[in-house]
């Protein structure tokens, strides 16, 4: 069912001006609609805050003030804010409508991007953030969902001002706003934010574009937050072998855990990004990343969230682990006492106190029995993650449990020697039962196979058979390896790596071919010579004037002496003949005057003095008569007597 049809705003006119046509997206703080400004007759995007936030008067006040400030931020890479207002319970922003998609859509469809494409997106994002930083704004919620890519290729940053307004409120409520995958450590630990939190988020953004995955991931937001605080962002080349070192440096500088080590704002990071691009060659910029599907995307992790700042982020516990103290504090048991007996005269009165005592004892006994049946004979498996076998046995004994069978298994997430439990931590189990322990052997490792000389497709298949991923492919000339076959791998053959790692391939372009010089040749002769050298020939449709006769080769690309691969194409541009010019009449002129006229008309000049003209200075004749035409650049001989 189309949920747009159920949205109460669709079809309404907000503030007597904005007609809501369709719902575009729903986020953690607002819903975005496509709307029409009925006064100006233009399509725009209308962002309407969720009622739970719009009901906060202090939020609305700050939001309006911030929105007005951001509306003055004019930059070609910032989504423009046209208007802000309220209509009853609705608080809205009227913004520029961008027909296109988000960076998240691109990553979901394509996975990793080529370095050139990643930098083409990153640089306008940093330009937009740099303008905001210099104007005193911090975005605070940079993520692929807030990078819009128009159908015309323009890159724009959305949601300026919105996150700042919400953060102004959350500073007073002890919370931090943001999307956990892109939060800087200082945002998590102290709730502080300056331009360097945007720099950090852009570093994560670049890593994700280059590798197709996030640097820190986990089963819960708490695990991701812990990794941001305690783990460095790995270099992109660890996920995509062969990635240029300059890109590793760029990501590392932007994602340093200490804010004082990062570039101080987006302008500084933009300068570093442009410097990195300048130091990369075309092969590095256009290197094709592994053709893998984009990683599964969890929308919940990329939704802007309000995170309690008071939360101390500890080493993440297993998903099912519970805090027993908290559980007990919130658990209440209720027992019903039997109804009072009706009075039965004096004997009943005398036996009343005894009956009450017996009744209470019966209730307590019944309650204890119920407790034992339901809870007393059970205990919880204590958390054993990251414990040694001895520590795990001791903790089990303290909980009244025995250690059962101990086995070993590979794990990509649990360190070597650490313990995972079965049943899992927090599970209810009968007292004195045994718990099987699984001891991690660490990640499974494999050796990079010897792929030298294999065709590229076969090499990729062999890597996948070994549990490895094909990495980036670069191409080089080789006199010994046939074109299309593997020259080498990175890491090299025999290297022990983690299963699932990517291996970069260097593929042969074959032996280089020296391009012969065919300028000035007849087309058929030139074609024959190039094809004999193993090259393809393409003839340009446009002809140019040159010193060569019409129909002959005027120029070639690549030029003579260039090194290309067998089968590459050489483009020939044919001559339409030399450019003609009228020859000036210089008979009777002095030598100096004649030379000036002829050279001014585009000709070269040669002098024929003979024996009689050794000391003369007057032109008595010329090789091409005055008024006739001759090719520009040709030589006119003057006779001097």
Swiss-Prot record:
Q: How is it modified after translation?
A: Autophosphorylated on threonine residue(s).
EC number(s) reported in the record: 2.7.11.1
The enzyme class is transferase
Q: Which residue range or ranges hold the PASTA domain? A: 375-441, 442-508, 509-576, 577-641
- Annotated binding of ATP, by residue: 24-32, 47
Q: Which residues form the active site?
A: 141 (proton acceptor)
Q: Name one GO molecular function term.
A: protein serine/threonine kinase activity
Record keywords: ATP-binding, Kinase, Nucleotide-binding, Phosphoprotein, Repeat, Serine/threonine-protein kinase, Transferase
Positions of the Protein kinase domain: 18-280
Reactions catalysed, as given in the entry: L-seryl-[protein] + ATP = O-phospho-L-seryl-[protein] + ADP + H(+); L-threonyl-[protein] + ATP = O-phospho-L-threonyl-[protein] + ADP + H(+)
Q: Which family does it belong to?
A: Belongs to the protein kinase superfamily. Ser/Thr protein kinase family.
Q: What is this protein called?
A: Serine/threonine-protein kinase PK-1
Species per Swiss-Prot/TrEMBL record = Streptomyces toyocaensis
């Amino acid at each position: 069912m189309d949920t747009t049809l159920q949205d109460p705003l669709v079809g309404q006119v907000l503030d007597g001006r904005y007609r809501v046509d369709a719902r575009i997206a729903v986020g953690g703080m607002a819903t975005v609609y496509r709307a029409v400004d009925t006064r100006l007759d233009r399509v725009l995007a209308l962002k309407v805050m969720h009622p739970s936030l719009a009901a906060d008067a202090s939020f609305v006040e700050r939001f309006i003030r911030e929105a007005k400030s951001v509306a003055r931020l004019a930059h070609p890479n910032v989504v423009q804010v046209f208007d802000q207002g309220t209509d009853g319970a609705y608080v809205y922003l009227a913004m520029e409508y961008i027909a296109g998609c988000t960076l998240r859509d691109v990553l979901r469809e394509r996975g990793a991007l080529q370095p050139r494409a990643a930098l083409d997106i990153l640089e306008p994002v940093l330009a937009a953030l740099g303008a905001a930083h210099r104007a005193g704004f911090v975005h605070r919620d940079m993520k692929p969902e807030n990078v819009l890519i128009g159908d015309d290729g323009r890159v724009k940053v959305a949601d300026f001002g919105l996150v700042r307004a919400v953060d102004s409120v959350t500073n007073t409520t002890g919370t931090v706003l943001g999307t956990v995958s892109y939060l800087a450590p200082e945002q998590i630990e102290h709730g502080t934010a300056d331009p360097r939190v945007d720099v950090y988020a852009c570093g994560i953004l670049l890593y994700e574009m280059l590798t197709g995955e996030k640097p820190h991931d986990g089963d819960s937001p708490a695990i991701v937050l812990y990794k941001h605080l305690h783990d460095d962002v790995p270099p992109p080349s660890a996920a995509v072998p062969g990635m240029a070192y300059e890109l590793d440096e760029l990501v590392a500088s932007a994602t340093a855990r200490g804010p004082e080590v990062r570039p101080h704002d987006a302008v500084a990071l933009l300068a570093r990004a442009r410097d990195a691009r300048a130091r990369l060659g075309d092969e590095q910029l256009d290197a094709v990343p592994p053709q893998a599907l984009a990683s599964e995307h969890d929308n919940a992790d990329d939704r802007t969230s309000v995170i309690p700042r008071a939360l101390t982020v500890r080493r993440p516990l297993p998903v099912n682990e519970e805090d027993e103290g908290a559980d007990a504090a919130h658990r209440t048991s209720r027992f019903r006492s039997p109804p009072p007996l009706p009075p039965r005269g004096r004997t009943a009165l005398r036996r009343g106190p005894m009956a009450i005592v017996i009744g209470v004892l019966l209730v307590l006994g019944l309650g204890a029995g119920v407790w034992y049946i339901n809870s007393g004979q059970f205990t919880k498996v204590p958390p054993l993650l990251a414990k040694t076998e001895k520590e795990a046995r001791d903790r089990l004994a303290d909980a009244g449990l025995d250690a059962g069978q101990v086995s070993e298994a590979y794990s990509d997430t649990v360190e070597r020697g650490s313990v995972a439990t079965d049943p899992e931590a927090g599970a209810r189990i009968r007292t004195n039962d045994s718990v099987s322990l699984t001891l991690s052997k660490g990640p499974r490792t494999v050796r990079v196979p010897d792929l030298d000389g294999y065709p590229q497709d076969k090499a990729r298949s062999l890597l996948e058979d070994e549990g490895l991923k094909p990495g980036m492919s670069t191409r080089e000339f080789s006199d010994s390896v046939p074109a299309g076959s593997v020259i080498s791998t990175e890491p090299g053959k025999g290297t022990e790596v983690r299963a699932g790692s990517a291996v970069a391939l260097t593929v042969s372009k074959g032996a280089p071919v020296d391009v012969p010089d065919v300028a000035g040749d007849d087309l058929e002769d030139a074609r024959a010579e190039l094809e004999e050298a193993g090259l393809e020939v393409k003839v340009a449709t446009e002809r140019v004037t040159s010193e060569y006769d019409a129909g002959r080769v005027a120029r070639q690309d690549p030029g003579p002496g260039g090194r290309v691969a067998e089968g590459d194409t050489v483009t020939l541009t044919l001559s339409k003949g030399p450019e003609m010019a009228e020859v000036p009449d210089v008979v009777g002129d002095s030598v100096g005057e004649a030379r000036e006229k002829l050279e001014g008309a585009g000709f070269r000049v040669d002098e024929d003095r003979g024996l009689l003209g050794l000391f003369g200075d007057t032109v008595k004749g010329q090789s091409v008569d005055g008024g006739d035409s001759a090719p520009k650049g040709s030589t006119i001989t003057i006779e001097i007597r």
